[in-house]
């Protein structure tokens, strides 16, 4: 188990570095996507992004802005996605759909490098998500 933890930690850092190398620096988005890619069923996660119904737990998750009306207390803008990690109210990042697709491109590329057998499915989901938000 100790070896597995070291490998996951190494992969996590490689993924964080890749995000930063590509100018993507929102720490909570990075943390959540890295956890999704390394600790969860990533294909189900991508399906959740496509359906706008991504995993939510007490300490990790994704919320779409269309779940709130402008008059709601939790409203955080139109066409945005909130990533949270941790229990503090301030432990979150909010990004646009365009930014979401940029972050997903990096994590999908990384995931495919480690799971080549799932490349076709991953790329299909990524393409469907980009088309949904009209991102090239």
Residue ranges, per PLM feature:
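Mixed-charge, Lys/Arg-enriched low-complexity segments
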Residues: 105-136
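Detector for Asparagine
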Residues: 2-3, 22-25, 90, 102, ...
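A sequence-composition feature that detects small, non-aromatic residues
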Residues: 34-37, 69, 119
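Alpha-helical structural motif
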Residues: 24-28, 42, 96, 118, ...
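Aromatic-enriched hydrophobic runs in primary sequence
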Residues: 18, 73-75, 104, 130-133
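Generic structural signal for short, flexible, solvent-exposed coil/loop and linker residues
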Residues: 17-18, 31, 51-53, 70-72, ...
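Negatively charged, low-complexity tracts enriched in Asp/Glu with abundant Ser/Thr
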Residues: 2-61
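Amphipathic protein-protein interaction modules
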Residues: 63-114
């Amino acid at each position: 188990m100790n070896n597995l933890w070291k490998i996951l930690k190494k992969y996590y850092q490689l993924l964080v570095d890749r995000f930063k190398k590509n100018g993507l620096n929102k720490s909570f988005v990075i943390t959540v996507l890295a956890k999704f890619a390394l600790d969860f069923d990533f294909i189900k996660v991508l399906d959740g992004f496509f359906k706008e119904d991504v995993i939510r737990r007490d300490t990790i998750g994704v919320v779409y802005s269309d779940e709130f009306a402008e008059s709601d207390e939790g409203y955080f803008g139109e066409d945005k996605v909130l990533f949270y990690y941790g229990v503090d109210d301030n432990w979150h990042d909010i990004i646009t759909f365009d930014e979401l697709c940029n972050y997903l491109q990096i994590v999908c590329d990384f995931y495919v490098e480690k799971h080549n057998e799932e490349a076709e499915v991953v790329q299909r989901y990524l393409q469907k998500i980009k088309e949904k938000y009209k991102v090239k």
